[in-house]
Amino acid sequence: MNTIHEESNIKLGGGLDDVWLNTQTGQLHIVDYKSTSQKTEGKQITLDDQWKAGYKRQMDMYVWVMRRKGFNVSSTGYFLYCDGDRFSEHEFLNAEDAVMHFKMSLIPYETTTDWIEPTLLSIRDCLSLEHTPDHSEACEFGVFLSLVSNPKGKA
């Protein structure tokens, strides 16, 4: 499932996990399944962790692509979290079998798509530069590349 953004000539898309039809509104809801095994006992699973920002951008992008393809898509998407509870009192692995209990959480998310087109145009501009831009200090790829290209601080 993808679309070509003509202004930037960038093809954007991905594989949807699921689409639910709201029979009352006729709108489609994008659903993304996530499976993890975190220490969440007694905690509610949320989208607040910094590393989950990518999940939100992914959902925004799915909604944007589906709308460009002419579908009536709700701004509300859902993350269905299946969290393996291997840290609880339940025995995970024993002599006869292995059993994992799962905590299921359905998390609604209000998408925002207004950032997508400006970002695609910025990507196009970046790809057209004669020299690559510097990495942000927060960019894990830039940190990795600098360590690989300059091990132990050697010049």
Describe the function of each predicted region.
Residues 65-155:
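Metal-dependent nuclease catalytic regions and adjoining charged, substrate-binding loops involved
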